Swiss-Prot record:
EC assignment: 2.7.13.3
Lineage: Bacteria, Bacillati, Bacillota, Bacilli, Bacillales
Entry keyword Membrane: yes
Designated gene of the protein: hssS
Catalytic activity annotation: ATP + protein L-histidine = ADP + protein N-phospho-L-histidine
Name listed for the protein in its UniProt record: Heme sensor protein HssS
Residue spans crossing the bilayer: 9-29, 164-184
Molecular function per GO: ATP binding; phosphorelay sensor kinase activity
Keyword Transferase attributed: yes
SMART domains: HAMP, HATPase_c, HisKA
Localization (cell): Cell membrane
Domain of life from the UniProt record: Bacteria
PTM text: Autophosphorylated.
Amino acid sequence: MFKTLYARIAIYSITVILFSALISFVLTNVYYHYNLKASNDAKIMKTLKEARQYEQSAKPTHIQQYFKHLGQMNYQIMTVDQKGHKTFYGEPFREDTLSQNAINNVLNNKDYHGIKDKPFALFVTGFFDNVTDNTVGINFKTKDGSIAVFMRPDIGETFSEFRTFLAVLLMLLLFISISLVIASTYSIIRPVKKLKLATERLIDGDFETPIKQTRKDEIGTLQYHFNKMRESLGQVDQMRQHFVQNVSHEIKTPLTHIHHLLSELQQTSDNTLRQQYINDIYTITTQLSGLTTELLLLSELDNHQHLLFDDKIQVDQLIKDIIRHEQFAADEKSLIILADLESINFLGNQRLLHQALSNLLINAIKYTDVGGAIDIALQHSHNNIIFTISNDGSPISPQAEARLFERFYKVSKHDNSNGLGLAITKSIIELHHGTIQFTQSNEYVTTFTITLPNNSL
């Protein structure tokens, strides 16, 4: 029954309607018992006493005819003479529940207030309880002696048309309410079902089909965010496919080259060629090892929850260590490295930050023309730490500039790098809550600028 949200909401709503009707009935019954019952008793008692006063003044020949006439005026009457004979006028009572003690009291000229003294019943409204003890009674003097007269209004006759009207009203109210609940529930569930189908399409790998945003409420917000999620998942899936393709290409090409070199190595007896092939194989395997290391680092950065960023880093000293480590490569190209470094402390992950800054210096050395210069600066700026590294070299096209930080992207197809260095650097800087930007001047001076929060304060 509750396997669908549609059934659950519909049944809950119908249950609320029925429960509300039941509670309303009980509260109305309580209100009648404590607020209306006494006044109703007094009103009927007044009517009965006026009837007795009229009977005594008019002295009708046949008092039975008088009571019969009252019965025809929508009253239910029971008379009891001194011998205990009971006579009923008007519509019959549902049940004769009046005690003999109450009858005797009325015969002894004591008024009976059965309506006011009716005990409270939770699911029975005293106003409609058609029994003889739910009456008022007084003593009538007749020529044959005293009789006890008990009377109550005939609710069934008085409100017969109204009861029919009320019954039709309640039936229509319930029918229309339940119909509207079912219809409104369907209108709520329909977009949820569409979301379910769209989710199933996502599971099957369909990231292209959007769902229409049909509402402006919470469901509409859910539809909007679902489409955003679909787009993000589509981008992630494309990145995954490109990543797999790029990794496959980066591994397949050197492996093919190694296979070719090994074949040549087996077929040649020239020691010079054999040594050259071995050196080439060593170079390629070194590149593969570097690719593996960078892929593992990328995976670590993508799943960074375990990484700690609580190392106290002397940034200027870290940069000096990197320059010293890469000085040999710079000297081979007769490059000058100029460093203007302020003494700055930073709280982060020293291993990762070393990798990020090393990547930038290695790139600068690689792409700077022979005999050129590399400028490095580190300084405070308000609440930030600014690191810049500039070098002169070949210009970079706007198309290439827009993709510099993409994984596996290479400015030149002849570049022997893996195309992961700048992507790794960007991820590391962002994990330190920083930013990295690339700019290029008209003189073909390229500059990378890293901005980090000054968290050492």
